[in-house]
Amino acid sequence: MGRVGVVSWGAYIPKYRIRTEEVARIWGDDPLRIVDLYLVDEKSVEGIDEDAVTIAVEAARRALRRATLDPRRIGAVYVGTESKPYAVKPISSILIDALGLSNNVFAVDMEFACKAGSEGLMAAVGLVESGKVEYGMTVGADTSQGEPGEHLEYSASSGGVALVVGREGVAAELEAAYAYASDTPDFWRREGSPYPMHGEGFTGEPAYFRHVINAARGLMAAYGYKPSDFAYAVFHQPNGRFPVRAASTLNIPMEKVKPGIVVTHIGNTYNASALMGFAKVLDQAKPGDKILVVTFGSGAGSNAYVFSATDLIKERQNAAVPTVEAMLRDKIYVDYAQYLKMRKMIKLFEY
């Protein structure tokens, strides 16, 4: 696929955290059982003045700062989220003014559950490869929803990642891409509903594992890769168990997966989930390292990518931008009452 690839990346994780044991305490669940079930110790919580827009803006600013890139050279902006503050009003157009981009930019919000942000990656790559734009940006950002007392509440969290793609200054070249999708009713949220629903019988084998495994195997078969070719492997992380099992099924050893695991510390950031693991790996990769990234979105589909780190990776890593590891350590714990307030889940009624 030529020299098109990731020029820069930026991530943002809200510093607030709520421990799994605190949520379990409120609902009378056994905290040890819940932690063992999901392998999520705590999750990130957006501040009371944060939403998917502010998270996307901060991640995108960090991506631009890392490459010292003139924002007016960005010709396309894609945003993937399940947490739009507005039913009808794009986040991508807000980014144009917030980041100082040109008004002559292709901008759109995308939707495919948790893989919309990574779908924007391919759209941006396509425009760059065609010569229509010099650089493109895709952002995955969410303040994901989980109904109080329902098991999604233990993992649904907040965060964002932005990727800039182009031909010049590439830090991680995109070598291969492959997709696998089908109509699978594993997870949905109807219009006007504040919380999603999920068909528990569909979330494992028919949805996540079928699509993730087929996308990864399809990519390796189509391009001739072997598990031993990859220095790192990153998967969508709805919980701590699924990506580990996916890697085992693909005969990828844990030492290649563990560096990209973030769900244990921040939960499932939905559109930023696999991308956050990818950003964490980019923070530490060496020139020549090949990185397998497999995203997943309910409904359902997976995209698999292979990136190869270039000699510019070290220069990008040395930029004055917070690493994912640093953000994982920078945290303030809140209790359940503060969590409800910050997530605006306490409703006031006028009489």
UniProtKB/Swiss-Prot annotation:
<dbReference type="InterPro" id="IPR004656">
    <property type="entry name" value="HMG_CoA_Synthase"/>
</dbReference>
<keyword id="KW-0012">Acyltransferase</keyword>
<feature type="active site" description="Proton donor/acceptor">
    <location>
        <position position="82"/>
    </location>
</feature>
<feature type="binding site">
    <location>
        <position position="245"/>
    </location>
    <ligand>
        <name>(3S)-3-hydroxy-3-methylglutaryl-CoA</name>
    </ligand>
</feature>
<dbReference type="GO" id="GO:0019287">
    <property type="term" value="P:isopentenyl diphosphate biosynthetic process, mevalonate pathway"/>
</dbReference>
<feature type="binding site">
    <location>
        <position position="114"/>
    </location>
    <ligand>
        <name>(3S)-3-hydroxy-3-methylglutaryl-CoA</name>
    </ligand>
</feature>
<comment type="similarity">
    <text>Belongs to the thiolase-like superfamily. Archaeal HMG-CoA synthase family.</text>
</comment>
<dbReference type="Pfam" id="PF08541">
    <property type="entry name" value="ACP_syn_III_C"/>
</dbReference>
<feature type="binding site">
    <location>
        <position position="236"/>
    </location>
    <ligand>
        <name>(3S)-3-hydroxy-3-methylglutaryl-CoA</name>
    </ligand>
</feature>
<feature type="active site" description="Proton donor/acceptor">
    <location>
        <position position="236"/>
    </location>
</feature>
<dbReference type="Pfam" id="PF00108">
    <property type="entry name" value="Thiolase_N"/>
</dbReference>
<comment type="subunit">
    <text>Interacts with acetoacetyl-CoA thiolase that catalyzes the precedent step in the pathway and with a DUF35 protein. The acetoacetyl-CoA thiolase/HMG-CoA synthase complex channels the intermediate via a fused CoA-binding site, which allows for efficient coupling of the endergonic thiolase reaction with the exergonic HMGCS reaction.</text>
</comment>
<dbReference type="GO" id="GO:0003985">
    <property type="term" value="F:acetyl-CoA C-acetyltransferase activity"/>
</dbReference>
<keyword id="KW-0808">Transferase</keyword>
<protein>
    <recommendedName>
        <fullName>Hydroxymethylglutaryl-CoA synthase</fullName>
        <ecNumber>2.3.3.10</ecNumber>
    </recommendedName>
</protein>
<feature type="binding site">
    <location>
        <position position="155"/>
    </location>
    <ligand>
        <name>(3S)-3-hydroxy-3-methylglutaryl-CoA</name>
    </ligand>
</feature>
<feature type="active site" description="Acyl-thioester intermediate">
    <location>
        <position position="114"/>
    </location>
</feature>
<feature type="binding site">
    <location>
        <position position="30"/>
    </location>
    <ligand>
        <name>(3S)-3-hydroxy-3-methylglutaryl-CoA</name>
    </ligand>
</feature>
<feature type="binding site">
    <location>
        <position position="298"/>
    </location>
    <ligand>
        <name>(3S)-3-hydroxy-3-methylglutaryl-CoA</name>
    </ligand>
</feature>
<keyword id="KW-0414">Isoprene biosynthesis</keyword>
<dbReference type="InterPro" id="IPR016039">
    <property type="entry name" value="Thiolase-like"/>
</dbReference>
<dbReference type="InterPro" id="IPR020616">
    <property type="entry name" value="Thiolase_N"/>
</dbReference>
<feature type="binding site">
    <location>
        <position position="241"/>
    </location>
    <ligand>
        <name>CoA</name>
    </ligand>
</feature>
<comment type="function">
    <text>Catalyzes the condensation of acetyl-CoA with acetoacetyl-CoA to form 3-hydroxy-3-methylglutaryl-CoA (HMG-CoA). Functions in the mevalonate (MVA) pathway leading to isopentenyl diphosphate (IPP), a key precursor for the biosynthesis of isoprenoid compounds that are building blocks of archaeal membrane lipids.</text>
</comment>
<dbReference type="GO" id="GO:0010142">
    <property type="term" value="P:farnesyl diphosphate biosynthetic process, mevalonate pathway"/>
</dbReference>
<dbReference type="GO" id="GO:0004421">
    <property type="term" value="F:hydroxymethylglutaryl-CoA synthase activity"/>
</dbReference>
<feature type="binding site">
    <location>
        <position position="268"/>
    </location>
    <ligand>
        <name>(3S)-3-hydroxy-3-methylglutaryl-CoA</name>
    </ligand>
</feature>
<feature type="binding site">
    <location>
        <position position="203"/>
    </location>
    <ligand>
        <name>(3S)-3-hydroxy-3-methylglutaryl-CoA</name>
    </ligand>
</feature>
<dbReference type="InterPro" id="IPR013747">
    <property type="entry name" value="ACP_syn_III_C"/>
</dbReference>
<comment type="pathway">
    <text>Metabolic intermediate biosynthesis; (R)-mevalonate biosynthesis; (R)-mevalonate from acetyl-CoA: step 2/3.</text>
</comment>
